[in-house]
């Protein structure tokens, strides 16, 4: 029991360390300051006409705007996301101040990814820092490619999930039938398995 609490304490400490690193990199967000993202300012200009129309006509939202390229569909600019059941979960995961929350989610996911490939906790923390703070991530945060950064933040989570699932599938009885299902039973001597 004591050993279990010790392990939980170590991982809780690592999570707090990763949160400290994420928000230590952008402490200004804790004071309410925001990153001036040029693409977000551009989006506000692109979407303004459609947003104003939709606010004035909630029963008849527009699917077209004249504010870009002489006219274009609004689905590429703004859309109605009612009925998206993942939104509450997503808001919970990204509940911190942005861009600190992007960095924290990336750090935590990359830490799990490093653990999934069998690295030590220390090396996993170092690898997570390398993944989260690569120069591309900093560039896309600065210009305002927020949805791209959010997608990148979840890449390590997905990869770690696949690896952990694969490793779990290799345990126990599954190990005996997996080669047959993947490569075909004709390649194996049935008595050897």
Spans of features found by a protein language model:
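Start-transfer (signal-anchor) and selected internal transmembrane alpha helices
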Residues: 1-26
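Juxtamembrane loop-transmembrane helix junctions in multi-pass integral membrane proteins
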Residues: 4, 90-93, 119
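Residue-level signature of transmembrane alpha-helical entry/exit and packing/kink sites
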Residues: 7-14, 103, 124, 148
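Membrane-interface coil-to-helix junctions
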Residues: 20-107, 129-156
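Membrane-embedded helix bundles of polyisoprenyl
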Residues: 107-117, 122-193
